[in-house]
Amino acid sequence: GEWWEKYRPFAVIFWSLLFIIPFAVKYGAGTAAETVLECLVNDYLTFIVLLFGLFCVAGNITVEGSLVGSPRVNVILLGIGTFLSSWIGTTGASMLLVRPVIKMNSWRRNKAHIMVFFIFLISNMGGSLTPIGDPPLLMGFSRGIPFFWSIRFFPILLLNMIILLTVLYFLDKRAYRKDIAAGYMPEIKENEPLIRFEGLHNIIFIVIIVAAVILSGVLPDVPFFQNAAGEVISIPIFGEVKLAITSLIEVVMILLAAFLSFKTTNAEIRKKNHFTWGAIQEVAVLFIGIFITMQPALMILKSAGAELGLTHPSQMFWVTGALSSFLDNTPTYLVFLTTAGSMGF
């Protein structure tokens, strides 16, 4: 609420210091600084820059038209948005489609269920096919998991889409009939096309962002970016903390795409999208704290993960699912990826 909006930076600082100070006392200020900088430079930086880039570019594309919210239209739009999430991110797809979905269903009385399914499909499970789609997969990609590895989830995604969209269709059909029976009727716009896009040139910048992420996994194997020892050329930050030149290239490409998107797009499009910086600011502040405070768990699991008694991947599946229901899925993913690695899964 209002308290969080006003004091969230202080809350993040408090919880971060709750880890940093005892850790510094036990292991030394230098080790504490290296630990914090390591996660911020090599995890948080690429994570937040990618979200920022997709947030900016998606905010410069608008969808207009005379589509009327009906069961069939809602199912089709949410289905398209689900697949779109894996390529422009769940945040980007949600930004792009939430306003059109709300607008085309504005004439209806019974419509709350539509946004629930929107969140299920577009804002969550839709990002499961690529590291662009969802931050946990991006963290896995940065740790060596191939970019297209998660494409194998497509049959699972498709099955869940069919189930959810079928449920949505019948729920929405029932609600739609109630609205019509109660006298609610949509406004018909005769001189307006069914659907109209503005700012479509921003697709170029989305492609640049996707290319930047893919290149961050390809360039480290190119000899040009390696030193004499065969290691990726890096920029020293502090102690043992280094920023790989390939990560810097990724960050620069994404920020350049975001900058060019703003420079080449009419500001009226952002006004139509009610574009503000509030959402990305909140994510940026919150995840600094998340990345820092999950370091103790990652360290413990690296050294003692095999002692947890987990002997099969299915056990991790159920535990991660349970934890992700009330924790963010990114730290949950990282914790159990580390656990699985320590156990040789």
Language-model segment annotations:
Residues 2-10, 31-45, 147-156, 193-197, ...:
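Interfacial loop-to-helix junctions that mark the boundaries of transmembrane helices
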Residues 13-25, 51-59, 81, 158-170, ...:
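Hydrophobic core segments of alpha-helical transmembrane domains in multi-pass membrane transport
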Residues 20-40, 55-69, 83-96, 296-304, ...:
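Transmembrane alpha-helix boundary signature
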Residues 21-24, 85, 95-110, 114-116, ...:
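Membrane-interfacial helix-loop connectors
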Residues 109-110, 129-130, 139, 148-197:
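Juxtamembrane and boundary regions of transmembrane helices in multi-pass small-molecule transporters
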